[in-house]
UniProtKB/Swiss-Prot annotation:
Homodimer. GO terms for cellular component: cytosol. Mg(2+) binds at residues 142, 171. Belongs to the transketolase family. DXPS subfamily. NCBIfam families: dxs, PRK05444.2-2. It holds the Pfam family Transket_pyr. Its EC number is 2.2.1.7. It comes from the Bacteria. One of its GO terms (molecular function) is 1-deoxy-D-xylulose-5-phosphate synthase activity. This is 1-deoxy-D-xylulose-5-phosphate synthase. The gene is dxs. It comes from Campylobacter jejuni subsp. jejuni serotype O:6 (strain 81116 / NCTC 11828). Binds 1 Mg(2+) ion per subunit. The lineage of its organism: Bacteria, Pseudomonadati, Campylobacterota, Epsilonproteobacteria, Campylobacterales.
Length: 615
C-alpha cells in the first residue's frame, strides 16, 4: 500500500520540519488535482492543511476524538488517515465522502455548521465518566462561530475543567460577522481613559515618521483588533493561545503541545489563508469555497456550454423583479448569499436584503417580526438548512400566521454532498403545520407565477425548487396560480394517473412519453400545491383512474403519498396509490443521475415498475 500521505502519530513525529512542509505541499497538490476533477470544497481544505497535519502529530487520531466542524475542511485528515488510495473517488458514487463519516473511520458525521464544540463537550463528559485520558480536538472555522450553538457550547465548556482543545481556523471568511457584534461589546473594554490616552501618544509618535505613519497606524489598529477574540474566550473561562500563523507548522505544533499540556479547555486561534497554495483561489472566498470540476491552469469551470439557467438564477431574477415592483419585499439568507442568489439583491437593495451569517434561527424569527410590521419577507434557504430553524418556523411564523415566504433551494437529491445535504424532508416537516401553504414549480414560467402568488398570499407559504436546472422547459402552458388548484396536463380515459409535484412532474412526463411510444397512456396532473390539495380535481380523477402513481422528490413518510392517502380516506375513495418517493433511509452521495439509478428512481427503472400495471 502506498504511504505517501498516510502517517501515524509516531511516523509524523520522526519527520523534520522541512519534511512536514514538503508533506503539506504534496497534499495540496493532491487535493487540487482531485477536486479539479470531482468538484468539492477547495479553498477551505487548502487553508487547513498544516492545521490537520499538526493535529495528527500532537494528538493520537486512533484514540483522541478529532471533530471537524462542518467537515468540509477534512480532506487532509482523510489522506493522513489512510484514505489516499481511494481519495480519487472523493464525492463519487460508492466512493469517499466529502465530509466526515463514522463508516469511514471518522469520529462523528458532519455537514451542517457549528456542532463541533458541543460534540467536544459531550465527548469530554463521556471520557471523564469512563476515567480515560483522551483529549477531544475540535477544528472550527470562524464562520461557524456566527451560529449560537457554538457559543452555547463554549459557555458550558468555559465553566468546566475538561481537557479539550478548540482549534479556531480564522481564514477571515466571515470573521467580521461572528465577531462583529460581540466586538462592539468587547471594544468597550478598550474604550478606557488609559487606552485612549495611550492611543493618542502612539499617534503623536507616528507623526514624527511621516513616510511610514500610515502603514504603522494600520498595523497598530490591527494589533488591537487581534485582542478582541482573545478577550471573548478568556471571559468565557477558556485558556487562549494566539493568534498564530496557521501555515507555520512549527508555531501550530508548539501551540497544540502547549494546549495539550494544560489539561484545561483551551482555544488556539490560528490565522490562515483560504485557498492557500492555489493562487487563483487565494482571496476569492465565495468563488472557490465549493466548486465543480475546473481546469487547474486557467481556473475555468468545466461545464456544458448549453447549460440552462439554474433554478437559483431564475429565483434570483424573479425576486429582483418583484422587489423593484413591491417596495415592502425584504429578504434574508443565512451565510449563503451566492448559493441562494440573494447576493444580487443584497447588492442592489442593501437596506432590504441581508446575510445574517450562519444563524438560521435568527433569520426566521427576525423576518417574522418584519412580517408583523407589514413587510413581506422572502427567506432564501437550502431545504436541508431550514431544519435548523424548525422551532422558529412553528413558533414564530405558523402560530402567528404571518406573511412569510420560504424559498427552499436544493430540494430533492443534491448529489455529491450526500446525506447531510439532501433536501428530501421539507415537505414532511412543513405539511403538518397549521396555516402553512406548500407548493412547487415544475418549470421556469411556473416559478415566476408561484413567486408572484407567494407575494400576494396571506399566511406563511413555502415553495421548493431543485439544485441545478428545471428539466421541463415549455412542454406545457403555464396556468394561473389559485389556492389549492392543480393543473391537468394530460387528460384521457386511462385508468392510470401520474401525480407530479415540483420536479417530479418532469419525471412523470418522461415516463409518460415512453409509455406513449408503446401505445400506452396515462393522465398527468401537476399538483402544484401539496397543501392544500385540489380535492375537487382529485375527486373527479378518482372516478376514472383507479391507479395513481406519485412522483415527488421527498421521502415517503409525510410526503405526497401520505397527504393523498389522507385525502382518499377522508372521502372514502378506493384508489391504489403507488409512490415513487424516497424510502425511509438516508441517501448517500454521488452524481444525482447515479444516485437515482442506485435508488431505482431513474426513468428506466420507473418505467419498468409502471409497465407492470398495464395489461
Amino acid at each position: 500500500m502506498s504511504k505517501k500521505f498516510a502517517h501515524t502519530q509516531e511516523e509524523l513525529e520522526k519527520l523534520s520540519l522541512k519534511e512536514l512542509e514538503n508533506l503539506a505541499a504534496s497534499m495540496r497538490e493532491k487535493i487540487i488535482q482531485v477536486v479539479s476533477k470531482n468538484g468539492g470544497h477547495l479553498s477551505s481544505n487548502l487553508g487547513a492543511v498544516e492545521l490537520s497535519i499538526a493535529m495528527h502529530l500532537v494528538f493520537d487520531a486512533k484514540k483522541d476524538p478529532f471533530i471537524f466542524d462542518v467537515s468540509h475542511q477534512s480532506y487532509t485528515h482523510k489522506l493522513l488517515s489512510g484514505k489516499e488510495e481511494i481519495f480519487d473517488t472523493l464525492r463519487q458514487i460508492n466512493g469517499l465522502s466529502g465530509y466526515t463519516k463514522p463508516s469511514e473511520g471518522d469520529y462523528f458525521v458532519a455537514g451542517h455548521s457549528s456542532t463541533s464544540i458541543s460534540l467536544a463537550v459531550g465527548a469530554c463528559k463521556a471520557i471523564a465518566l469512563k476515567g480515560e485520558k483522551r483529549i477531544p480536538v475540535a477544528l472550527i472555522g470562524d464562520g461557524a462561530l456566527s451560529a449560537g450553538m457554538a457559543y452555547e457550547a463554549l459557555n458550558e465548556l468555559g465553566d468546566s475543567k475538561f481537557a479539550c482543545v478548540i482549534l479556531l481556523n480564522d481564514n477571515e471568511m466571515s470573521i467580521s460577522k461572528p465577531i462583529g457584534a460581540i466586538s462592539k461589546y468587547l471594544s468597550q473594554a478598550m474604550a478606557t481613559q488609559f487606552y485612549q490616552s495611550f492611543k493618542k501618544r502612539i499617534a503623536k509618535m507616528l507623526d514624527i515618521l511621516p513616510d511610514s505613519a500610515t502603514y504603522m497606524a494600520k498595523r497598530f489598529e490591527e494589533s488591537f483588533k487581534l485582542i478582541t477574540p482573545g478577550l471573548l474566550f478568556e471571559e468565557l473561562g477558556l485558556e487562549y493561545i494566539g493568534p498564530i500563523d496557521g501555515h507555520n507548522l512549527g508555531e501550530i505544533i508548539s501551540a497544540l503541545k502547549q494546549a495539550k499540556a494544560m489539561q484545561k479547555p483551551c482555544v488556539i486561534h490560528a490565522q490562515t489563508i483560504k485557498g492557500k497554495g492555489y493562487a487563483l483561489a487565494e482571496g476569492k472566498h465565495a468563488k472557490w469555497h465549493g466548486v465543480g470540476a475546473f481546469d487547474i491552469d486557467s481556473g475555468e469551470s468545466v461545464k456544458k456550454s448549453d447549460a440552462k439557467k439554474s433554478a437559483t438564477e431564475i429565483f434570483s431574477k424573479n425576486l429582483l423583479d418583484l422587489a423593484s415592483k413591491y417596495e415592502n419585499i425584504v429578504g434574508v439568507t443565512a451565510a449563503m448569499p451566492s448559493g441562494t442568489g440573494l447576493d444580487k439583491l443584497i447588492e442592489k437593495y442593501p437596506n432590504r436584503f441581508w446575510d445574517v451569517a450562519i444563524a438560521e434561527q435568527h433569520a426566521v424569527t427576525s423576518m417574522a417580526a418584519m412580517a408583523k410590521e407589514g413587510f413581506k419577507p422572502f427567506i432564501a434557504i437550502y431545504s436541508t438548512f431550514l431544519q435548523r430553524a424548525y422551532d422558529q418556523v412553528i413558533h414564530d411564523c405558523a402560530i402567528m400566521n404571518l406573511n412569510v415566504v420560504f424559498a427552499m433551494d436544493r430540494a430533492g437529491i443534491v448529489g455529491e454532498d450526500g446525506e447531510t445535504h439532501q433536501g428530501v424532508f421539507d415537505l414532511s416537516f412543513l405539511a403538518p403545520l397549521p396555516n402553512f401553504t406548500l407548493l412547487a414549480p415544475r418549470d421556469e414560467q411556473m416559478m415566476q407565477n408561484i413567486m408572484e402568488y407567494a407575494y400576494l398570499h396571506q399566511g406563511p407559504i413555502a415553495f421548493r425548487y431543485p439544485r441545478g436546472s428545471f428539466i421541463l422547459d415549455k412542454e406545457f402552458n403555464p396556468c394561473e396560480i389559485k389556492l389549492g388548484k392543480a393543473q391537468w396536463l394530460v387528460k384521457n380515459n386511462s385508468e392510470i394517473a401520474f401525480l407530479g409535484y415540483g420536479q417530479g412532474v418532469a419525471k412523470a412526463w418522461q415516463v409518460l412519453r415512453a409509455l406513449q411510444e408503446m401505445n400506452n397512456n396515462a393522465n398527468l396532473i401537476d399538483l402544484i400545491f401539496a397543501k392544500p390539495l385540489d380535492e375537487e380535481l382529485l375527486c373527479e380523477l378518482a372516478k376514472k383512474s383507479k391507479i395513481w402513481f406519485i412522483f415527488s422528490e421527498n421521502v415517503k413518510i409525510g410526503g405526497i403519498e401520505s397527504l393523498i392517502n389522507n385525502f382518499l380516506q377522508k372521502y372514502d375513495l378506493h384508489v391504489k396509490v403507488v409512490s415513487f418517493e424516497y424510502e425511509d433511509k438516508f441517501i448517500e452521495h454521488g452524481k444525482t443521475s447515479e444516485v437515482e439509478k442506485n435508488l431505482e428512481k431513474d426513468v428506466n427503472s420507473l418505467l419498468t415498475k409502471v409497465l407492470k400495471f398495464y395489461h
